[in-house]
């Protein structure tokens, strides 16, 4: 049986070994005779479909090259499938940016961890620890606007969807510990829009691997220096 399985694989790959040919010859058979006895392998015709996504990148429909809707679905804010129409039995596993539906678990694989849309949370902790904020399992608090393509958050506190996030990434001042984020006179926002106090931010700075005791800290954030006893002070 093992020999037949191997022979079948070799014939399908069109790479029959000399050993297999000798074995067939000893049985009075040829490769062509065996090939004619095998059931044809069904290979579906390849078809191109174009994605139609919402403003977050969540696929809502697959459009054929003829302009027909081959698949469509409706989701809630957290990515839960509410309904779908799939007359051609297409396999569409892509969800929110960076996510792929796992049929076995019902969860969404998000590169570094799994996201549960029913809970609106990750099921494992953020692998970058406190740099992602206090809540290790949190998904963006406003999923209508924000996404988390990698399942990670950077020390750069500007959301990745904001243009200023990439600008802040370019700030590199030797010997200075720099922080960027949206702020107010009394607080600063994390990358997931949660509010952080001065004490919260100080804790993150202290445990950041790039921070050394005595370093100058520069805060690139609007409004955090306004008024007396401001957040920046």
Swiss-Prot record:
Record-linked InterPro entries: RHS, Rhs_assc_core, T6SS_VgrG/RHS
Q: Which residues form a coiled coil?
A: none
Q: Name one Pfam family in it.
A: RHS
Gene3D superfamilies per record: RHS repeat-associated core
Database matches in PANTHER family: PROTEIN RHSA-RELATED, PTHR32305
Q: Which protein family is it in?
A: Belongs to the RHS family.
Protein name (database record): Putative uncharacterized protein YibJ
